Amino acid sequence: MAVSESQLKKMMSKYKYRDLTVRQTVNVIAMYKDLKPVLDSYVFNDGSSRELVNLTGTIPVRYRGNIYNIPICLWLLDTYPYNPPICFVKPTSSMTIKTGKHVDANGKIYLPYLHDWKHPRSELLELIQIMIVIFGEEPPVFSRPTVSASYPPYTATGPPNTSYMPGMPSGISAYPSGYPPNPSGYPGCPYPPAGPYPATTSSQYPSQPPVTTVGPSRDGTISEDTIRASLISAVSDKLRWRMKEEMDGAQAELNALKRTEEDLKKGHQKLEEMVTRLDQEVAEVDKNIELLKKKDEELSSALEKMENQSENNDIDEVIIPTAPLYKQILNLYAEENAIEDTIFYLGEALRRGVIDLDVFLKHVRLLSRKQFQLRALMQKARKTAGLSDLY
C-alpha cells in the first residue's frame, strides 16, 4: 500500500525540514515503487538511538544486459537534506556482499556524491540514479555459491585472503560528527522478493599467478617470500584505493570549483549589465535635468517679459476684437453696463440723501433713454454678426 503525503508528514513530524524532506521522498517513491518509507530506530556507534525514516526496498540495476533488483536501505537523518542520508546494501539470505571501493563488509555505501553532499545541489532522487549507474558497473552483491557435499573441503595452499574495507581520506569525514557510521548491529529491513543475481566468476577477482614458494613449508611455517608477497599485495591494494579516493576527491573538488567559476562568471556578467543599465539611466536623467533647466529658464524669461509688458500696456488696448463689428458690440456692451452701474449708484445717492429726488429722476430718465438706444443698437449688431439675442 502506497504511503500518502500526509502519512509521511506524520512520520517525519520531528524533522527540522519536514516539508522539503517529504517532497523529495514523494518524488523518489513515485519513480521507484519498490522503495517504501519505514519509521524505525537507528543505533549509532556511541550506542545512542533515534527514530528515523528509512527508504527500504530494491532499485533496478542493469548489469551485463540483465536487470537485477539490488536491495538497499537509505536512512534519512532528521537534519536532511542538509546532511546526506546513510546508505546501506541489505542482501537477502541468498546473497553475499561484494566489498569494493563503494561498499564495505557491513554493506555501507561510500560515494563521492555523498562525500560532497550539499543542499540544494544534492538530492535523494539523483543519489539513487547515481547508485544505479555505479552498481551497474560494480554490483554490490552476488548470489551465494552452493557447495556440493560430495566434495571434500578445500584446503588453502597459502595464507587466507585479506579483505580491506574502503577507508576515507585522513582528516575527512563523510558524515557529520553527530551522525557516526552505522555499527554492525544495524536494524534489519524487510525487502520484497528479488530476482536472481549474478553469480561470482573468476573474472570478478584478479587472478594471481602461481608461486612455487606459496604455502606453508613442510615444517609448518610460512616462508618469508610468502609473507613479503602478501604484504606487497595488501599495500598495493591499499595504495591503489587511497589513490583512487584522492583522485575522486580532487575531481569532485575540481567540478565544484568549475561550477563556482561558472556562477562567478554569470554574476560578473549580470553586474556588468546592471552597471551599463545604470549608466544609461543616469545619462537619461542628466538629459532630462538639462531639458527641465532650459524650460525653466524659458518660462522665467517669458514671465518676466509679460510682467514688464503689463506695467506699460493699457488695459483697453490689450483686448482687440478680430472684426470692427465685434469691436462695436464690445463697446456698446461696455457702455450699456456703465450706464447700468451709474443708475445703481444714483439710487444709492438718493437713498443716502446726497441728491434730491428731482435730480435723481432727471438723470435716470436721460440714462435710461440712452441705455435703451444702446441696447437696440447692440441687438441689431449681434443679429448682423449672427449671434443670439442677449435680451
From Swiss-Prot:
Pfam families attached to this UniProt entry: UEV, Vps23_core
Q: What's an example Gene Ontology biological process for this entry?
A: exosomal secretion
Q: Which InterPro entries match?
A: ESCRT-I_UEV_domain, ESCRT_assembly_dom, SB_dom, UBQ-conjugating_enzyme/RWD, UEV_N
SB domain mapped to chain residues: 323-391
| Residue window of motif PTAP/PSAP motif | 321-324
Which tissues and organs express this gene's product? Ubiquitous. Higher expression in brain and mammary gland. Lower expression in liver and tumoral tissues.
Modification after translation: Monoubiquitinated at multiple sites by LRSAM1 and by MGRN1. Ubiquitination inactivates it, possibly by regulating its shuttling between an active membrane-bound protein and an inactive soluble form. Ubiquitination by MGRN1 requires the presence of UBE2D1.
Family, as annotated: Belongs to the ubiquitin-conjugating enzyme family. UEV subfamily.
Q: Write down what this protein is called.
A: Tumor susceptibility gene 101 protein
Gene source species? Mus musculus
